[in-house]
């Protein structure tokens, strides 16, 4: 994320992290809002856990747990994917979204 786009990317990340998380081969898993498993020894994932914890501690983020999301780590990037399901009344039909965050740009984000 360069200096011209951080607010847009952070808004997308915050939007995604509002929802219940499902593991996708790598990453972490939420069960009723609590982290129950995570990768250790990886700076990108450790940084991600800090950001996730901060976002989920806000009342606004913790009140809407309608959607599933997966986070997959590729070579040099984090891929956030969520499926907007019918449990969320805002969406009449399921919708699939993906956000790609290069690890090198994700790590220096402010805490």
UniProtKB/Swiss-Prot annotation:
InterPro entries: Rhabd_NV
Pfam families referenced in this protein's UniProt entry, alphabetically: Rhabdo_NV
Gene that encodes it: NV
Function: Plays an essential role for the viral pathogenicity.
Source organism (scientific name): Hirame rhabdovirus (strain Korea/CA 9703/1997)
Similarity field: Belongs to the novirhabdovirus NV protein family.
Domain of life of the organism encoding this protein: Viruses
UniProt protein name: Non-virion protein
Lineage: Viruses, Riboviria, Orthornavirae, Negarnaviricota, Haploviricotina
């Amino acid at each position: 994320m360069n200096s011209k786009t951080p607010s847009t990317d952070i808004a997308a990340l915050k939007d995604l992290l509002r929802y219940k998380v499902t593991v996708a081969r790598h990453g972490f898993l939420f069960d009723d809002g609590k982290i129950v498993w995570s990768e250790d020894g990886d700076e990108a994932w450790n940084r991600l856990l800090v950001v996730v914890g901060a976002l989920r501690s806000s009342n606004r983020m913790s009140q809407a747990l309608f959607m599933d999301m997966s986070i997959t780590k590729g070579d040099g990037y984090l891929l956030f994917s969520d499926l907007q399901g019918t449990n969320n009344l805002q969406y009449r039909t399921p919708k699939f979204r993906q956000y790609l965050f290069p690890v090198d740009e994700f790590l220096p984000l402010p805490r």
